[in-house]
Amino acid sequence: MKRVLLSAPFDKPWSNGPYLETALRELGCDVRRFDFRSSQDPNEQIVRMAQDLSPALHIVWKGEAYLPETLHRLSELGTYSVLWHPDISLPPWLPALAQAADLCCVQSRAMLGPFGRAGIRDPQWLMEGVTPSCFAYDTITPAEWRKYECDVGLIGTVDHVPGYLRRLWALERLMREGWHVKWWGRRVSLLRNPVRAWLSPARRAWGGGPVWGPSYAKACHCAKVLLTLPPDPQAPGGLSNGAFMATGVGAFYLSLYRQGMEEFFDLGREVVAFHDEDEMVEKVRYYLSHEEERRAVAEAGRQRTLGNYTNHHAFRRLFSIIAGRGGPRA
């Protein structure tokens, strides 16, 4: 396999850089990582690394710290650069950087049109998935069961801002219904949130800070229902990798319906969707009282993800795209 230089976030324990790096290594790639967000001078440092290592391929996840000139310099050194953009947005700095890359990929299919109109040549749709080995664990201790066990769990930001506010309301509703609810993520801060969020009873359901890797998998395993409320459910064109992480570790995935999600999962058989709070409550009540069905859905979702939506699938597709465009073969 070719040597790959991976520019991605590694600065937080929950950063996705390690997931991408592990998948590349498991595919046999010689990977050298670079955390551009932690570097004082990322543009010069990445060029020096390319000079020293002579990588055939440079994969940039988001890459907001880079200048277009940097990718041009890497190209002159013989390194093929791929810019992988995960967001449903087109920030002002992005078009010039994407035009400088040899290949640009987007997480959401809905971004193909905006990228093309911005003058970015032949962008490709490439969804980030899950790296299963990063979530493996041997056992769940009694203390961990006490920490994570609940009827309904939610992993992510709970805040007063639009998009995240519906999570606050949903947790409050589930608590009023009498279910044992927990959520994991950054604690609600009085400095960042108005009194409405600070006084919410959902604060009492806080189960702890962000979870990642094995702790993420344990939280998913111990929650009978994993609730997901995407902040942008009407955004078409793909799912976030959070859907594949949750299903990949075997969670029973109950999500606010996101446009197009039936393209990726068989709704009702592999994951379950709802459209409003009343339907959410109805689905929670049903599946909490039908354990065998709940377990069957979780297992079917896990099998679908492991068979189709891992980062190994994503990188194999990426290598195929690159080879088809005359780039280096992995």
Over which residues does each language-model region extend?
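Membrane-proximal helix-turn-helix segments that form the acceptor-binding/catalytic region
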Residues: 88-102
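Conserved acidic donor-binding segment of nucleotide-sugar-dependent glycosyltransferases
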Residues: 271-277, 287-291
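N-terminal Rossmann-like NAD(P) cofactor-binding module of classical short-chain dehydrogenase/reductase
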Residues: 59
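Active-site proximal beta-strand in glycosyltransferases
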Residues: 74-88, 105
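A charged, aromatic-enriched C-terminal amphipathic alpha-helix characteristic of glycosyltransferases
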Residues: 289-320
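Catalytic-core regions built around general acid/base machinery
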Residues: 70-77, 97
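Nucleotide-sugar donor-binding catalytic core of glycosyltransferases
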Residues: 1-49, 53, 62-69, 99, ...
